[in-house]
Design a protein with these regions (language model features):
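Venus flytrap/periplasmic-binding-protein-like
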Residues: 39-42, 47-85
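Residue-level recognition of the N-termini of beta-strands and the immediately preceding loop/turn
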Residues: 5-8, 34-37, 62-65, 120
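Short helix-capping segments at alpha-helix termini
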Residues: 1-4, 30-33, 54-62
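Hinge/cleft segment of the Venus flytrap/periplasmic-binding protein
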Residues: 97-143
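Hinge/beta->alpha junction and helix N-cap segments in small-molecule ligand-binding domains
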Residues: 1-23, 39-45, 69-74, 90-98
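Extracellular/periplasmic ligand-binding modules, especially the Venus flytrap/periplasmic-binding
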Residues: 42-50, 80, 92-108, 128
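Short, well-structured alpha-helical segments in soluble
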Residues: 18-34
């Protein structure tokens, strides 16, 4: 099931747009248009990859699919412009609410059963897929 991919390479860009741009240019010089997909662990690095694609003059229709994570305003704008196929929204508000609720429960020495802690320690706040179809909804959340 799914699509079989060959991993051509990887690069570490330390969550940094500029480093991601440099690393992507290096990968493009090595693999040219054989790169079909760029998965970045945050939107900043995805945007750095987009910057490299733009600066190297590759025609947009030849770009690989670019996906980021975090759903930052800049990342959402890249999705809206069609430069990234998607990002994954990291809901900081839900995370903050969960931390506050947990802190209050701990301070009051209340049961933590309702928090459904994973491994007795973690609260999972699900990420949300953002694509061109729903990007405007997420941009509104950031206003």
């Amino acid at each position: 099931a799914g699509i079989v991919l060959d991993k051509l390479s990887f690069a570490i860009a330390n969550w940094n747009r500029s480093q991601a741009c440099t690393k992507t240019k290096q990968l493009l010089s090595k693999f040219n248009t054989n790169i079909e997909l760029i998965l970045a662990n945050n939107d900043e690095m995805a945007i750095g990859a987009i910057q490299a694609l733009t600066e190297t003059g590759i025609a947009k229709e030849q770009w690989p699919i670019v996906i980021g994570i975090d759903g930052t305003e800049d990342g959402l704008e890249q999705v809206k412009e069609g430069n990234m196929i998607g990002t994954v929204y990291n809901d900081g508000i839900k995370q903050a609410d969960a931390i506050a609720d947990l802190s209050i429960a701990l301070a009051k020495n209340e049961s933590l059963d309702s928090f459904n802690l994973k491994n007795g320690r973690y609260i999972r706040s699900p990420y949300q897929k953002v694509t061109i179809e729903n990007v405007d909804d997420y941009l509104k959340l950031l206003q």
